[in-house]
């Protein structure tokens, strides 16, 4: 939408990019994983031949045939994949969707990202979990193990003005939010998010 070539890349164990995007092409993320593990492939060429483009303009990799293949990627292999994606120069923006784990936050992989977006619905339960997470981040930062709080944003999804409440803690900044869209398809929800221009402040 802002004229930037954007890649959506998921390393979630059960992530399926094809739920959000559709595009032509016969290759999947399996081919990228094989190339990473073989260490013999020109990764820029592999990305160009494997990536698909949705009608929205977003680029993505179709999910592989087995979730275990993603789980099998080592931290070093994921790091090399991210570095190769950035070094390829193909994309202006890379959105990396990943499972939340403290192990991931402690990884030096977080040094490769410019912003970390955490999702919350603003409910009492969600806010309590969010607070516990951030308190743990603060402890790890004081121990010198990580330095990520300044990169963190909170994005509210399925937020209710009646029962939801914003999180106000530490250095975490609010990116914006969206209400629950009842009976809407995935594509309709994406269209509504785009209209909110939530992510523009990250592109400054």
Spans of features found by a protein language model:
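Short loop/turn segments at strand-loop or loop-helix junctions that form parts
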Residues: 11-12, 60-65, 121-122, 178-180
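Hydrophobic, Leu/Ile/Phe/Ala-enriched alpha-helical segments that form helix-helix packing faces
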Residues: 1-3, 82-89, 137-144, 200-203
């Amino acid at each position: 939408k802002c004229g930037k070539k954007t890649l959506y890349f998921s390393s979630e164990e059960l992530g399926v990019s094809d739920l959000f995007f559709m595009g032509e092409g016969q290759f999947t993320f399996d081919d990228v994983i094989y190339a990473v593990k073989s260490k013999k492939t020109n990764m820029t060429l592999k990305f160009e031949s494997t990536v698909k483009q949705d009608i929205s303009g977003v680029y993505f990799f179709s999910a592989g045939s087995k979730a275990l293949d993603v789980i099998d990627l080592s931290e070093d292999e994921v790091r090399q994949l991210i570095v190769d994606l950035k070094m390829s120069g193909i994309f202006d923006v890379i959105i990396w969707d990943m499972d939340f784990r403290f192990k991931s936050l402690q990884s030096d992989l977080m040094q490769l990202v410019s912003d970390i977006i955490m999702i919350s619905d603003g409910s009492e339960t969600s806010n309590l979990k969010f607070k516990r997470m951030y308190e743990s981040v603060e402890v790890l930062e004081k121990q010198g193990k990580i330095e990520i709080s300044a990169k963190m944003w909170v994005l509210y999804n399925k937020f209710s003005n009646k029962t939801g409440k914003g999180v106000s803690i530490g250095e975490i900044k609010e990116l914006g939010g969206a209400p629950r869209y009842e009976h809407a398809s995935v594509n309709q929800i994406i269209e509504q998010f785009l209209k909110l221009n939530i992510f523009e402040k990250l592109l400054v």
